[in-house]
Amino acid sequence: DVSVEVPHAGFPQKYLETKACRIALQDALLRMFGKALAKKDKTRKASGKSGTVRVSRPGQEVLERTALTISPKTGDLRLNMNVGFPANGRKICSDVLEQILFNQLPPMIENNLIYANLTDAQKEELENVYQLTCNQQAIRQYIQDNDLAAFVANGSVLPRVSGASDLPMEDAVEFKSPEDLEIAIDVPFGAPVKGMKIPLGVTLIVGGGYHGKSTLLKALERGVYNHIAKDGREYVLARKDAMKVRAEDGRAVHNDDISMFIQNLPNIKSTVSFTTEDASGSTSQAANVAEALESGSQLLLMDED
């Protein structure tokens, strides 16, 4: 593993003012640097992992990662990456490694991780990321201030390509809110965002098979995270304390109070301080709900047929 410190990378202070904006900047820079590495890797002549330089590959969510961090106080940037040392048998090819570390990497870092050296297109991309993040946080604040559970914007693309991919499905039907649940939320950048509000309380999603019930619930489940542009779920946002709960046959449970759901067990076990190494479907789901409530969650998501 190789770590690189870039003192005073020079990114505008507004990108670092809030935690959400700083994380979005770090995420965008990591993606930008990853693309530059991918282009360079195509010209690599070595086989296997020899001579490769790799960084963490972000998914669709915008998350804080140790792969790239920026200090909000000093603006110093730290990049952590993995370098596959070029080798010949059991020997490291030091001359090739020197080329990678001292000739190839420095210009890539200078051109992609120092603000003054970015192209106009790269700077515009970072500004778009900043504006999207500000809009997302404004909607999250609206959800909190108005006792909502979640918000789903009109035009959102909820279906994914497959169960093994988190990419948006092409030609999917875009989400449209029912009129009686539609609201418009003012955001710092652009026109108000229209979509469906989900108030706090018990909300039941019903419909026929293949009508998107689980797809909507899955999108709400991921709504605790911000998503990148063109994901389709940029403005599908839920309370930050939302938790998905379900039955987990066979899970271990230790000293959970599930007496609100189950009081009398045939083996005379206490449900006030329930313990087992092999929970059934009902006791595991009861334990999951109890643990979610103990953690402070005010929004439970359950997919039950």
What kind of region is each of these model predictions?
Residues 238-305:
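Switch/coupling sub-region of P-loop NTPases
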Residues 21, 25, 97, 101, ...:
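Helical mechanochemical/support elements of P-loop NTPase systems and associated helical scaffolds
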Residues 130-184:
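Charged, amphipathic alpha-helical linker segments immediately N-terminal to NTP-binding catalytic cores
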Residues 226-240:
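Flexible phosphate/Mg2+-sensing switch loops adjacent to catalytic phosphate-binding sites
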Residues 86, 156, 210-211, 248-250, ...:
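Short, ordered loop/turn segments at secondary-structure junctions
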Residues 1-147, 158:
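N-terminal accessory targeting/assembly segments
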Residues 181-197:
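Pre-Walker A adenine-sensing motif
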